[in-house]
């Protein structure tokens, strides 16, 4: 009976982590594709030049892959050391997520202030050499989200000159449409537009967050249950 429970738990744990590992592979693939095909699109922040969408997806995909692999191997080999490592990694990730979430809400005003200032500093690099990625990133978000600048279109004046904004700020994009024509440009800043997008999609994002939390808790529960079941059977393993 005990052996049957062990086998059942083992294969449930293996299947769970196989899906987890495949998700990591998918994220890693998407991140590499973004890095290769969209390599000229970079971050908006001069303080964190490596914090691009591609690098972020690659990092998350790698963590998920490694964690899933540990879980798969620990389950199929019935190795307590690997199962414990899997549990500890998930616990660390969960605690880190909770700490970051708490800090974000506690210091939300400070985060908003620093983020806006950092983005404005990034605008100064818009037409400089070796910053084509930053320029492309701003052009895309302004065209796609119908916004201009960080807080509003006047953020571009110290960068491009009085009454001048990038052409992608224009409601109807055409060459040099942003020169001395502020009446036909998007007035809302991109920072506010992004906040509005998050607010409009908060239910979807909350659901995704809850699903991730449930998956992490299930993974920890499966690993500890299997760990205890292996321990009870009295099997011996090499650490």
UniProtKB/Swiss-Prot annotation:
Membrane topology: Multi-pass membrane protein
Topological domains annotated Cytoplasmic: 1-13, 77-85, 225-239
Keyword annotations of the record: Glycoprotein, Membrane, Transmembrane, Transmembrane helix
Gene Ontology cellular component list: membrane
Glycosites: 180
Subcellular location: Membrane
Residues in the Extracellular compartment per record: 35-55, 107-203
Transmembrane domains' residue ranges: 14-34, 56-76, 86-106, 204-224
SUPFAM superfamilies in the cross-refs: Tetraspanin (SSF48652)
UniProt cross-references to InterPro entries, sorted A to Z: Tetraspanin/Peripherin, Tetraspanin_animals, Tetraspanin_CS, Tetraspanin_EC2_sf
Family under the similarity heading: Belongs to the tetraspanin (TM4SF) family.
Protein name, per record: Tetraspanin-9
Organism, scientific name: Xenopus tropicalis (Western clawed frog)
């Amino acid at each position: 009976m005990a052996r049957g429970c062990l086998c059942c738990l083992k294969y449930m744990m293996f299947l769970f982590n196989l899906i987890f590992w495949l998700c990591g592979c998918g994220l890693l693939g998407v991140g590499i594709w973004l890095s290769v095909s969209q390599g000229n699109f970079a971050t908006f922040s001069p303080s964190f030049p490596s914090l691009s969408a591609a690098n972020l997806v690659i990092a998350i995909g790698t963590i998920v892959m490694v964690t899933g692999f540990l879980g798969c191997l620990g389950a199929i080999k019935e190795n307590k050391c690997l199962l414990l490592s899997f549990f500890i990694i998930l616990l660390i990730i969960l605690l880190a997520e909770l700490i970051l979430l708490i800090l974000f809400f506690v210091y939300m005003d400070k985060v908003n202030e620093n983020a806006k200032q950092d983005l404005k500093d990034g605008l100064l690099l818009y037409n400089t050499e070796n910053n084509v990625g930053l320029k492309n990133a701003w052009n895309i978000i302004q065209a796609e989200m119908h916004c201009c600048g960080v807080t509003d279109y006047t953020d571009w004046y110290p960068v491009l000159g009085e009454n001048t904004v990038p052409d992608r700020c224009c409601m109807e994009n055409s060459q040099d449409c942003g020169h001395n024509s502020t009446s036909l440009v998007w007035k809302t800043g991109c920072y506010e537009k992004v906040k509005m997008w998050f607010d409009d999609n908060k239910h979807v994002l909350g659901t995704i967050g809850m699903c991730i939390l449930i998956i992490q808790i299930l993974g920890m529960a499966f690993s500890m249950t299997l760990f205890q079941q292996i321990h009870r059977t009295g099997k011996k393993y090499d650490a």
